């Protein structure tokens, strides 16, 4: 802790046009373990206690932010947001009681956890090209009609996604390929390793989630 939050609170307390009503934290993104939120809850209640005791400021709301992860691939194991919120609520209630301060409203920002599982991106297949690698093996590149301009996460973070042929069914054997975008950039990768039917053709639609 740097003390920056307490300094900001002191400045707000001196301004008659402002009222400090809440504290906010953000611990990260695509989180699959609730322990970080539990630590943040304890620290933010401790800060609320200091503000109450040292400056007479009563905090009405604690916002622990978002970052709850969702399942992009089968190995991802998301937090149950409702269960986590109930657990954090108990932690905050107990911590406030121990600190001798009123229990504030507890808020979260589970944006991706709510809307992410409902969203699918559709791409149209363009060029399909086997490319020989240095080892003498071939990798099939499947280009699509967009890429890093609508989703930069693969290039920046190495994010992984699931991809399926969406416009038709196919009984063709699967082939290992790399789905790439349309931009003039070597890092424009949509899905790094994807198993798609060998009869994949330009004009097919791929669903990425």
Feature locations, PLM:
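Active-site-proximal beta-alpha core segment in soluble small-molecule metabolic enzymes
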Residues: 1-61, 70, 91, 96, ...
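A broadly tuned preference for mixed-charge, low-complexity surface segments
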Residues: 18-34, 72-80, 162-165, 171, ...
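Active-site beta-loop-alpha junctions enriched in small/polar residues
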Residues: 25-32, 62, 67-69, 73, ...
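Short glycine/threonine-rich loop-to-helix capping motif typified by GTGT followed
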Residues: 33-40, 71-84, 115-127, 193-196
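Short linear functional motifs in flexible/disordered or boundary regions
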Residues: 35, 56, 74-76, 100, ...
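Glycine-rich and small/hydrophobic secondary-structure elements
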Residues: 79-96
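Charged (often Lys/Glu-rich) extended helix/loop segments that serve as interaction or gating elements
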Residues: 87, 93, 101-209
């Amino acid at each position: 802790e740097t003390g920056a939050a307490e300094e900001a609170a002191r400045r707000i307390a001196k301004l008659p046009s402002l009222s400090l009503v809440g504290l906010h934290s953000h611990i990260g993104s695509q989180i699959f373990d609730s322990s970080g939120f539990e630590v943040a809850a304890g620290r933010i209640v401790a800060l609320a206690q200091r503000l109450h005791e040292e400056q007479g400021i009563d905090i009405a709301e604690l916002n622990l932010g978002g970052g709850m992860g969702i399942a992009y691939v089968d190995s991802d194991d998301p937090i149950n947001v409702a269960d986590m919120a109930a657990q954090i609520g108990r932690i905050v209630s107990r911590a406030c009681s121990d600190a001798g301060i009123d229990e504030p409203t507890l808020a979260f920002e589970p944006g991706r956890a709510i809307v992410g599982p409902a969203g699918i991106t559709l791409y149209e297949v363009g060029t399909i090209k086997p490319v020989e690698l240095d080892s003498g093996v071939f990798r099939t590149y499947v280009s699509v009609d967009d890429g890093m301009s609508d989703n930069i996460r693969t290039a920046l973070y190495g994010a992984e996604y699931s991809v399926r042929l969406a416009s038709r069914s196919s009984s063709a054997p699967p082939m290992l390929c790399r789905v790439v975008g349309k931009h003039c950039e070597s890092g424009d990768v949509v899905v790094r390793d994807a198993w798609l039917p060998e009869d994949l053709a330009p004009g097919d639609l791929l669903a990425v989630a």
